[in-house]
């Protein structure tokens, strides 16, 4: 949300700098198109308000429900329970097989 607010303010600053940097003839055309720029600003504000109203969760991958958060936690708890249910093996056997970091170490491959 802060990103969108900063983006809008940045765009307005860039637009105002662009308008003041134009020669006099171009400034007149900018003033004549003031109605169009107001419509553009209103359109931008409507788009941003639409993003911020309720669909901002869809920007980050959809709505996050409590079930989505609980499922990985339950999976981790099940994995821990399964790990603890195994007979207690020595540390060497519990490690992943085939991790031979040194040439003299034991591997269970």
Swiss-Prot record:
Under the heading Pfam families, the entry gives: Somatostatin
Q: Provide the disulphide bond pattern.
A: 98-109
Predominant place of localization? secreted
Location in the cell reads: Secreted
For this entry, list what GO says about its biological process. Answer: adenylate cyclase-inhibiting G protein-coupled receptor signaling pathway; regulation of cell migration
> Might you report a single GO cellular component term?
extracellular space
**Biological function:** Somatostatin inhibits the release of somatotropin.
This protein is called what?
Somatostatin-2
* Biological classification of the source: Eukaryota, Metazoa, Chordata, Craniata, Vertebrata
Gene designation per UniProt: sst2
């Amino acid at each position: 949300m802060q990103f969108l607010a900063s983006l809008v303010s940045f765009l307005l600053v860039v637009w105002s700098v662009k308008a003041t940097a134009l020669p006099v003839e171009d400034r007149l055309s900018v003033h004549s198109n003031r109605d169009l720029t107001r419509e553009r600003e209103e359109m931008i504000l409507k788009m941003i308000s639409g993003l911020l109203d309720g669909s901002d969760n869809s920007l980050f991958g959809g709505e996050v429900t409590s079930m989505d958060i609980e499922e990985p936690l339950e999976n981790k708890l099940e994995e821990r329970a399964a790990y603890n249910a195994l007979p207690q093996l020595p540390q060497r056997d519990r490690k992943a097989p085939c991790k031979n970091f040194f040439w003299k170490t034991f591997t269970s491959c």
